[in-house]
Amino acid sequence: MRHTEERYISLLTDFGFKRIFGTKPNKDLLIDFLNSLFNGEQVVKDVTFLNSEHVGDVHTDRKAIFDVYCENEKGEKFIVEMQNAYQTYFKDRSLYYATFPIREQAQKGEGWNYKLKHVYIVVLLNYDMSDPAFSDDTINHDIGLLDKQTHRVFNDKLTFKYVEISKFNKRIEELKTNYDKWLFVLQNLSRLDCQPEYLKTAVFNRLFAEAEIAKFTRAELREYEDSLKAYRDIKNSLDSAEEKGESKKAIEIAKNLLEMGMPIEKKSNLSKLYNLTK
């Protein structure tokens, strides 16, 4: 039995994000989003999805599991992540993630000359990052390896793109670019009860058709509802803890759990936090 009232999935959930951007049948949606983000700086013609789970050089190393990991027709690597809540060392985590697509390019033997393909880390942030390096009124942040004095590019093989989608506040009639439209649906898809005229293009026709919950199988619906519940549970717990002025540690735990997609009530070792936020 369906319990979800919305017509379309939320792209902020783990299930919704990966269904739209991380599956082979929907790779055209990922390609369109990336091209709208890069706006001519990079033109992606095709993508191949790669294994999103990585481990280090030895079995004791920590795993890294990406939301979406793919390469384009030139062999350049893309990690695409949705980050729903602040994490203390999030920038360090992004840098750590970047080491995997860099290291896996190493060729065995003595013939490799260390030439690398470009690696892009694209992160969609569902909160205000409030980073001192960023302009407060800017949504897109483009980070690379630069000389501090000249501000010229030192090496162009590693790019971080942070997109603070929570700052996007255009109304539907104000959407001008394809990129505007993507940011709008990332924020608002699950709130819509029909496909607006402003979003009736070939790619968004595909998106709305794929995102319609009524078309899900029972298994897909169950998986989505679990993902949505996990998202709402942790969000509600986080908001409640912040309102009550609970400890930063408790709030940080809730935020970290949100990234793991875990319903808070199912974590016995977090019973104290859960009780605080009831």
Locations of regions flagged by a protein language model:
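Short, charged alpha-helical interaction segments and adjacent helix-coil junctions
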Residues: 2-6, 78-83, 183-278
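Accessory alpha/beta interaction modules
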Residues: 1-161, 169-171
